[in-house]
From Swiss-Prot:
<dbReference type="GO" id="GO:0019253">
    <property type="term" value="P:reductive pentose-phosphate cycle"/>
</dbReference>
<protein>
    <recommendedName>
        <fullName>Fructose-1,6-/sedoheptulose-1,7-bisphosphate aldolase</fullName>
    </recommendedName>
</protein>
<keyword id="KW-0113">Calvin cycle</keyword>
<keyword id="KW-0602">Photosynthesis</keyword>
Length: 36
């Protein structure tokens, strides 16, 4: 999986007409689970 900036992700989503979900978490473990 390639790492890209948030700006690149949002630009690609806008060009191709899809949304990017947003997740709010307060613990590292929860964030790691979301990313998997």
């Amino acid at each position: 999986m390639a790492r890209i900036t948030l700006r690149q992700l949002l630009d690609h989503a806008a060009e191709h007409g899809y949304g990017v979900p947003a997740f709010q978490h307060q613990q590292y473990g929860a964030g790691a689970c979301i990313m998997e």
